[in-house]
Amino acid sequence: MIILGIDPGTAITGYGVIEFIGNRYKPITYSCLRTEPDLPLDLRLKKLYQGLMDIIKRYQPDCMAVEELFFNKNARTALAVGHARGIALLAGANSSIPVAEYTPLQVKQAVTGYGKAEKQQIQFMVKTLLSLPEIPKPDDVADALAVAICHAQWSSTFGGRIK
C-alpha cells in the first residue's frame, strides 16, 4: 500500500509518501510545498492544489492521510490550516483516492505509543521507523510522514479510518 501523508498549511504543507508492506515501512519521497506569503490566498491555495495533484500523479498513492485540524488559539492560523486541509481533501477526492483523517493525538499514539508525546519523540520515531539518515526538515515534513505511518498502523490494525 502506498500512502500519501499530508500536514496541511498555507505557508508550508508537508508531505510524505511511504510504502507499507506487511509490517515494514519504506520511504518513497518526502518534502514540502511552500507558498509565498505575499501572494493572495486564492493563488496560494491554487499553487498548493497543483503541487498536491502533481505528487498524486507522480506517485499514484493508494490512499491519502491528512492531519485533522486541532484547536488553535489564533483564529487566523486555524482558518489558514482549514483552507489548506480543504485543498488536500479536494485533491484526494478529485483523484478518486480514499482519504483518512487523524487527530494529532491519534498520530502521536500510533507513532510513539503515547498520545501526549513531544514533537522530538515523534520526529525520532519517524526517523527510526523509516530508517532515515536524519530527521526530516522542516517539522511539517516529519509530521506528514507521521500521519502516513499512523494510517498504516490504523489500516493494519483496524481496517483504516477512511471518511
From Swiss-Prot:
GO terms for molecular function: crossover junction DNA endonuclease activity; DNA binding; magnesium ion binding. PROSITE patterns: RUVC. Keywords: Cytoplasm, DNA damage, DNA recombination, DNA repair, DNA-binding, Endonuclease, Hydrolase, Magnesium, Metal-binding, Nuclease. The keyword Nucleotide-binding does not apply. Gene3D superfamilies: Ribonuclease H-like superfamily/Ribonuclease H (3.30.420.10). It catalyses: Endonucleolytic cleavage at a junction such as a reciprocal single-stranded crossover between two homologous DNA duplexes (Holliday junction). Mg(2+) 1 binds at residues 7, 140. GO terms for cellular component: cytoplasm; Holliday junction resolvase complex. The keyword rRNA processing does not apply. Binds 2 Mg(2+) ion per subunit. Its cofactor is Mg(2+). Signal peptide: none annotated. Disulfide bonds: none annotated. InterPro entries: RNaseH-like_sf, RNaseH_sf, X-over_junc_endoDNase_Mg_BS, X-over_junc_endoDNase_RuvC. Mg(2+) 2 binds at residue 67. It comes from the Bacteria. It is found in: Cytoplasm. Belongs to the RuvC family. NCBIfam families: PRK00039.2-1, ruvC. The RuvA-RuvB-RuvC complex processes Holliday junction (HJ) DNA during genetic recombination and DNA repair. Endonuclease that resolves HJ intermediates. Cleaves cruciform DNA by making single-stranded nicks across the HJ at symmetrical positions within the homologous arms, yielding a 5'-phosphate and a 3'-hydroxyl group; requires a central core of homology in the junction. The consensus cleavage sequence is 5'-(A/T)TT(C/G)-3'. Cleavage occurs on the 3'-side of the TT dinucleotide at the point of strand exchange. Homodimer which binds Holliday junction (HJ) DNA. The HJ becomes 2-fold symmetrical on binding to RuvC with unstacked arms; it has a different conformation from HJ DNA in complex with RuvA. In the full resolvosome a probable DNA-RuvA(4)-RuvB(12)-RuvC(2) complex forms which resolves the HJ. This is Crossover junction endodeoxyribonuclease RuvC. It comes from Desulforamulus reducens (strain ATCC BAA-1160 / DSM 100696 / MI-1).
